[in-house]
Amino acid sequence: MLLEAIFHEAKGSYAYPISETQLRVRLRAKKGDVVRCEVLYADRYASPEEELAHALAGKAGSDERFDYFEALLECSTKRVKYVFLLTGPQGEAVYFGETGFSAERSKAGVFQYAYIHRSEVFTTPEWAKEAVIYQIFPERFANGDPSNDPPGTEQWAKDARPRHDSFYGGDLKGVIDRLPYLEELGVTALYFTPIFASPSHHKYDTADYLAIDPQFGDLPTFRRLVDEAHRRGIKIILDAVFNHAGDQFFAFRDVLQKGEQSRYKDWFFIEDFPVSKTSRTNYETFAVQVPAMPKLRTENPEVKEYLFDVARFWMEQGIDGWRLDVANEVDHAFWREFRRLVKSLNPDALIVGEIWHDASGWLMGDQFDSVMNYLFRESVIRFFATGEIHAERFDAELTRARMLYPEQAAQGLWNLLDSHDTERFLTSCGGNEAKFRLAVLFQMTYLGTPLIYYGDEIGMAGATDPDCRRPMIWEEKEQNRGLFEFYKELIRLRHRLASLTRGNVRSWHADKQANLYAFVRTVQDQHVGVVLNNRGEKQTVLLQVPESGGKTWLDCLTGEEVHGKQGQLKLTLRPYQGMILWNGR
């Protein structure tokens, strides 16, 4: 047993409360080194002579180097001490505690979770756990009111190829008109990229945080949109651009006019005066040298209060949550206060950050409920679209990503295939619809919350920005209606099968050579097995039936029964076919 590879800490994603009397603990060990992992635990103040409770830690998954184990400690009090008992392949056993490793329990020490406070139990909105999110880029979704079209509005056409300065006239009235379409699709929440006043088509350079952009409509129209969506059971999530403002934002205009005498000079990161908006700016911006997007100094109390007032205003209009742009470049203290504010106004409001990398620093229950899961997207691109990785590597990447976060966060990560910032996934697949469908099936069944970028469901293509922002195709004869029906069916299954929204996830099969991948999601006695043939040829696979699973499984997409024999399921899959199998009592 390689002791140097064994890791645990009594915090973060390795020890976190599920409730005031339940603690989830994880342990990492070298792959294949530990065959049994037990956790012995008691109240922190229990005497050494008292009998310890035992919990068996099951294997949560593996990556290329490590196995990960998880146990749920059912605690009699809110104070916990615990030690691991690890057994190797040859029967060798060792205790592992805060002091280190020892053959004697008393010499290994104990890990301690001092006290489980109710305020530290990470909770997320119940509705979000079962949500299917649909992302709308308002300028390109639907034009419902031509009277507010900006000058130079271009023709809304299937073959449109937008430029960075293109406008097509999409607006909020257009979204209202298309709510029946979205309801038919089955989505339960709409995420809007920015809708506040701004000179650009994308609106990430905010001029007025308290006004709807006139090209999109007005406040009464927005309120109608919220009411109509809510009537259909659809939530509304807005984009908050608090990392930076636009160069037409009132405070920045004041700095441009008054220079060092401006009362707002400390709202921004200005190096010297006068302020220069040339290609070489002397102030911090979004990304690198983007003059139209000056970075806000969010640790400034005045900036913080202004942005909090913005959040209050829009929540008073009835929105259900926020997606936070460039969230990883805003200070943590700001987000902690933001969470307290938002949850005080609406405990059921959802807070989602835009973070493209490991977001564990923001997902411990004190800042965000979720993030846009770009780690998921990277793995999905390389497995389904480009074929850069095989099934075994894919499984390893998924496991490693799951272990980054508490299960409350992992359950609600926004699993996206593409967005307004990326190439369309169908384009990434080289237009291969079979590959695309297989990835969508995975997205709709895997742990997390599916996020659909507008138009994916009817087969829209597009390279990177601005091509990924083409106007939505509304003529049915130009839409891929078969793909639309495929999305509808998968969303319907997701809503119907509790395992797909509430279940844990365990790897079932990962064949490096055949590129076959399977996983199982379980809640109580309900199992859903998902089997994916990520190869352009017909293949047969034998799967061991999970211990608690029955012999007969239902193919949810065909309605046919699949019968196990001698503890195995024999399945034959067409090229790029996915199967969703249900087994329960």
Curated annotation (Swiss-Prot):
One of its GO terms (molecular function) is metal ion binding. It catalyses: Hydrolysis of pullulan to panose (6-alpha-D-glucosylmaltose). Gene3D superfamilies: Glycosidases, Golgi alpha-mannosidase II, Immunoglobulins, Oligo-1,6-glucosidase, Domain 2. The active site is at D325 (nucleophile), E354 (proton donor). Its cofactor is Ca(2+). InterPro entries: Glyco_hydro_13_cat_dom, Glyco_hydro_13_lg-like_dom, Glyco_hydro_b, Glycoside_hydrolase_SF, Ig-like_fold, Ig_E-set, Malt_amylase-like_C, O16G_dom_2. Binds 1 Ca(2+) ion per subunit. SUPFAM superfamilies: (Trans)glycosidases, E set domains, Glycosyl hydrolase domain. The record marks D421 as: Transition state stabilizer. The keyword Secreted does not apply. Ca(2+) binds at N143, D145, N148, D149, G169, D171. Its EC number is 3.2.1.135. Pfam families: Alpha-amylase (PF00128), Alpha-amylase_N (PF02903), Malt_amylase_C (PF16657). Hydrolyzes pullulan efficiently but only a small amount of starch. Endohydrolysis of 1,4-alpha-glucosidic linkages in pullulan to form panose. Also cleaves (1-6)-alpha-glucosidic linkages to form maltotriose. Monomer. Belongs to the glycosyl hydrolase 13 family. PANTHER family: ALPHA-AMYLASE FAMILY MEMBER, MALTODEXTRIN GLUCOSIDASE. This is Neopullulanase 2. It comes from Thermoactinomyces vulgaris.
